[in-house]
């Protein structure tokens, strides 16, 4: 079976949510303690985190979630073609030169703003602004800048040459709200599943830990780079749509009625999401036989199947290839790509994740 091309997975003209991931070459622990060499490279996780944070400020891409581990990372990104279209030509060029400064600035180690002459030089190149506008809302270019930076810096520290990353990064499109929820939980629980920490608050380089620290004592300012978790509007169990597959026209209608360009991520508050993660973590550890009886109330409000969500959140990477969603969402995505079907859940998995009150509910379960 041929591999889906990246251009099939990513739709540049539509706001979409994507799960992106990459692994270090030969699965070596080059961003943590490496048992083979006995060297601790944990400080490199902070390098990757700071670079991601810096890039997020200049790209027209929302970072919904992240997890940086010893030998791989996960990102949940939302492209924002609506934002980049609002930017002037000068703003586009200035943002790109902050991401990729001129050779002279790099050689001198400068971090100043680009000069008017540098901006004019870029603008005068044929089709250059149009190309840069496309890049600023393309997750592939953000991952490229992130991976290249880490590869060069880590190889320089080790005084070696060669590949740092195993291959090109993987990308999976999240087609509906339940897929976004399941994937975000999968990413945020990665350190817990890897037995690196026991609680969701205990790991420094994961999005849920950063959100909770900011919520508790304002110790970390996420407002400038990490997308808000809670959707705008009321979160009272009523139907709310995550903006993850709208056209520019549809998105413009929403933003015209709002003073903010932040879209949010999930139809729930941070407290509800944290409670859900703790419950999912207890399911993974098998803490007690009555855990299923203490299902978080948010699942009842959103009418989600707890068994299906738990299974999807713990095995998300194995269940879906280049797209994730309920069978109806996968069928629509297959039609968009001109394919007969997209690999998703097998019949056995669908039966396992089917809700007791509906024969159409599958994992990730779709809000009804």
Regions found by a protein language model. Give the residues of each.
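Short catalytic/metal-binding and nucleic-acid-binding patches
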Residues: 1-368
